[in-house]
Amino acid sequence: MTLLSKRSLYLAAATAVLAVGALVFFKSGTEIAPESKFVLLDGSSKTTAELKGRVTLVNFWATSCVTCVAEMPKIIATYNKYHPQGFDTIAVAMSYDPPAYVVNYAQTRQLPFNVAIDNTGAVARAWGEVKLTPTTYVVNKRGEIVKRFVGEPDFAELHKLIESLLKQV
């Protein structure tokens, strides 16, 4: 092999590596929401597949989490503001949260959205081994996770994102 052909080969290989790297770097970054079955307080259930067609906030929380309790009025306000436009919320209580506490909290605060109890921890595992609360996912109409917040979201940013997603087909 001549020096020129070796250089050409190395240049072609480097170009291929850069192209693959660029493809990975510029990929949309969205992932499909995991298949999950949410067991709601009334005993009914909802699946991830049923979320399609609506922008949905999936909020992992606990009654013992100070930040979760503090952000809940903002989650309620967000739900009330955007629900008529095709927005939904599922609040998933962590497996360590006593069901009686979750039911009491949901009833006394009159939570207007679906509240699920993750008794086995299967939902938290499916959504990326959620351990910290609050952890909140925003799912678009196609069932793709477009944003994950750990801790209380910046609600102004969240509202802009929801408004943008609601406009999408």
Locate each region found by the language model:
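N-terminal targeting signals for export/organelle localization
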Residues: 1-39, 169
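Short extracytoplasmic/periplasmic juxtamembrane "stem" segments immediately C-terminal to an N-terminal membrane anchor
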Residues: 36-54
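Solvent-exposed coil/turn segments that connect beta secondary-structure elements
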Residues: 41-43, 63, 94-97, 118-121, ...
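Short active-site neighborhood of thiol/selenol oxidoreductases, capturing the structured segment around
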Residues: 48-66
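Alpha/beta-hydrolase fold active-site loops
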Residues: 55-56, 87, 134
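Hydrophobic beta-strand core positions in alpha/beta domains
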Residues: 57-59, 91-93, 137-138
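Structural microenvironment flanking redox-active thiols in thiol-disulfide oxidoreductases
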Residues: 69-109, 119-125
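Thiol/disulfide oxidoreductase modules built on the thioredoxin-like
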Residues: 104-112, 119-164
